[in-house]
Amino acid sequence: MTVPGPFTMSQQAQNDFYKTDAECALDYAAAVNEEIRDLFAAGADVVQVDEPYMQARPEKAREYGLTALNRALEGITGTTAVHICFGYAAIIHARPSGYSFLPELAGCRCNQISIETAQSKLDCAVLEKLRGKQIMVGCIDLDDQTIETPEVVAERIRKALRYLRPEDVILAPDCGMKYLPREVADGKLRSMVAAAKLLRAEYAGRR
């Protein structure tokens, strides 16, 4: 289950009430915290907080975004993830080769961090700074309708496995699969599942 993050909502909102945007973000965080608690009470197994604006506005994210995010996760005992991305692939085609805000999430209360690596060809060395977190590695390029082979997907994951333990890696698509034709999306997901099976066999016993 996903919920919008407090920092991202504060960046999209018009603030006519709070003295500072930081105050606004913290009140959003309190509301998100209640929502997360309700979702777990209703039976959710994982709740993901989407924070794309941390990549878009890293200075403000450092100033008060991480504080707001941690407030949203305060006291939560269920498994939580934070998603940070470059925007939908169908809309934003040019991707930077690295995140402007990512190592900072080592200080986040979440259990998992969801990132994109396929379209951006991310240098996965940055993941070494996130040890202790499970990483959802975006490994499906959603700007290209070509269906990757399982081996292509597996090789993208191997780049992350240079810096992470196998048990800390979760395979996922990059951001924005909803724009793909259903048959293309289905084919890409099947390749991702096949890549996961391939990698499990390859890394069995390496923990």
Can you say where each PLM-predicted feature lies in the sequence?
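Domain-level signal for soluble alpha/beta catalytic cores
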Residues: 1-207
